[in-house]
Amino acid sequence: MTLQVCKDDPWLKPFEEELLRRQALVGQWKDHFAKEGGLAEFAASYKRYGLHVNKDNSVTYREWAPGASEAVLTGDFNGWDRQQYHMTRDEYGLWSVTVPPTSDGQVAIPHNSKVKLALKTSNGQWVDRLPAWSTYVVQDLSKSPIYEAVFWNPPESEKYQWKNKSPPTPANAQIYEAHVGISSSEPRVGTYKEFTKNILPRIHKLGYNVIQLMAIMEHAYYASFGYQVTSFYAISSRYGTPEDLKELIDTAHGMGITVLLDVVHSHACKNVDDGLNNFDGTDHQYFHGGAKGDHPQWDSKLFDYGKYEVLRFLLSNLRFYIEEYHFDGFRFDGVTSMLYKHHGLGTGFSGGYHEYFGDEHVDQQAVVYLMLAHELMRELQPLLRPGEDAGNFLSIAEDVSGMPALCRPVSEGGVGFDYRLAMAIPDMWIKLVKETRDEDWDMGNIVFTLTNRRHREKTIAYAESHDQALVGDKTLAFWLMDKEMYTSMSVLSDPNPIIDRGIALHKMIRLITHSLGGEGYLNFEGNEFGHPEWLDFPREGNGSSFHYCRRQWPVVDDKLLRYQHLNEFDAAMQHRGDHYGWLSADQAYVSLKNEDDKVVVYERAGLVFVFNFHPNKSFTDYRIGVDQPGTYTLVLDSDSPEFGGFGRIDHEKTRCHTEPLEWNGRANCMHIYIPSRVALVFAREDDPRRK
């Protein structure tokens, strides 16, 4: 039997045996999990591992630590007595102990009290560890930078009560990438509650239907942007409590917004005292032993995805966030590093299929883990979210390699992701604005980069994400306008050609990326209004300053500043995109890429998109080809005054009638006026979606 992916892409046929072998490995793991009730039940291990209250109010603690010779649970609850609760070990290295209730039948370990695991390693040394399955850990910098585990077991009256169902899966994924900690305009760490109150309404008003939350999994080093995870089951306590995060997600759901977790399963922080590294005294418990377990660039540890208990830990982690916090899916970080033994370092991908296959290049165990993760989400769908209107669990891969079939179902021979990030697109835009004169922009290369994606594999397009905002780089707006943003963004200022150019190109770049670059779109928090400068977390090198570690919301709220115009355009783009459904439509038909005129024309979702990137030439009676005959009028004009434009087009008088003359490969044509540095979107007057 030929796999569906090989039918769709004949270039995969020589590698079908390897694709089938991956499927067989997934099947073998499922057979192993069957003895624990199957994949979904295996991934419910978070309900058994860690600390859990039993019906009789006793507390049972389980921890896998095969390299330890003794284990003791201790904490505030017993005065840190290291003799009272010695744990027993089974043949697989699973330690357990039960703490009986108090004499009056209450839970002996108080809510929000601190606990520790003391382990005796094989060399006879006693070490303290945070339980690996801790759901809340805290830091008291007045005492130590090392995190401490907390037993989170609030009384029923303090537990968050869910009010809203998860929304249906959006057909047009418009993603707002956000970081709770930087969401305050003040120079400090923001909170879950502040995000719920102040930021969610902004996101909803803009028209985004998905939020991708970064830096939620606990990380000891704030400046790691959340990518050096220390406690995988603990949500970051910097921003508040588990109940606060639940309120945030529930409120978003009430607004019809899907919420994704930026999950980091590609590596782990190398911290020992408050991480997983050397947890049981060995370097090979959760990770590969020796140099194989070290990421040469990230200075972090690499999971051994071929181990039964590692799969338990990671697969359960996914179900935990879905079931406990009602996350609607995941953006998997660092997928390229997982897929390949070389981690994508020092390797350029030419597109040759041999680069994506073979045990020499590919970490098959990691690929199989990702396939199992998607099989888990598929199994959990009817179990946790029954009903036709229930949203599906979404997944996005951060992969720069372009591995074929990454975003195809496991049953068809793929890895299972719904989307991949179009990581070449932001690189193209930054390179253009940094290195190339406007008059030398290559329309053909822009279009090629935006449309270069695999057949039947969906892509999330973006002009910039958090990666481009970090210190050492700058936001797109700052590359375009730089220091002029400090002095010339007032609506009362004299006209400034640098600002005018920057605002015009910022809108054009985002619209062409949104409408041509993929089947979904992503924006990083604040960039919708052209956030100035860069992002720099407090660290030793900047005097622990929060000055660049915040979002400057006052500039977009100030009606005397031009940031409002970029914000209004972004909102119009999101609302038009969702209304007309161009992201879920077939890929665009590009009818014109004129290098001399710097004009690009394409059609998608029954709309006609026209871009004039020329720095100073406007065109009257410019003939363009269109597929459908009729009368066309504007539904979006980047030059409109409310978007900071010059209002060079009279919308009331702009009615473009087609002629039955073939032009640029289209059956009809029409004549339009295209001012310089303007993007226009036309729809037929009789389009029922205009009603």
From Swiss-Prot:
One of its GO terms (biological process) is glycogen biosynthetic process. InterPro entries: A-amylase/branching_C, Branching_enzy, Glyco_hydro_13_cat_dom, Glyco_hydro_13_N, Glyco_hydro_b, Glycoside_hydrolase_SF, Ig-like_fold, Ig_E-set. The keyword Protein transport does not apply. One of its GO terms (cellular component) is cytoplasm. It comes from the Eukaryota. The record marks 467 as: Transition state stabilizer. Keywords: Cytoplasm, Glycogen biosynthesis, Glycosyltransferase, Transferase. SMART domains: Aamy (SM00642). It is an enzyme of class 2 (transferase). It catalyses: Transfers a segment of a (1->4)-alpha-D-glucan chain to a primary hydroxy group in a similar glucan chain. SUPFAM superfamilies: (Trans)glycosidases, E set domains, Glycosyl hydrolase domain. Its EC number is 2.4.1.18. Belongs to the glycosyl hydrolase 13 family. GlgB subfamily. Glycogen-branching enzyme participates in the glycogen biosynthetic process along with glycogenin and glycogen synthase. Generates alpha-1,6-glucosidic branches from alpha-1,4-linked glucose chains, to increase solubility of the glycogen polymer. This is 1,4-alpha-glucan-branching enzyme. It comes from Yarrowia lipolytica (strain CLIB 122 / E 150) (Yeast). The gene is GLC3.
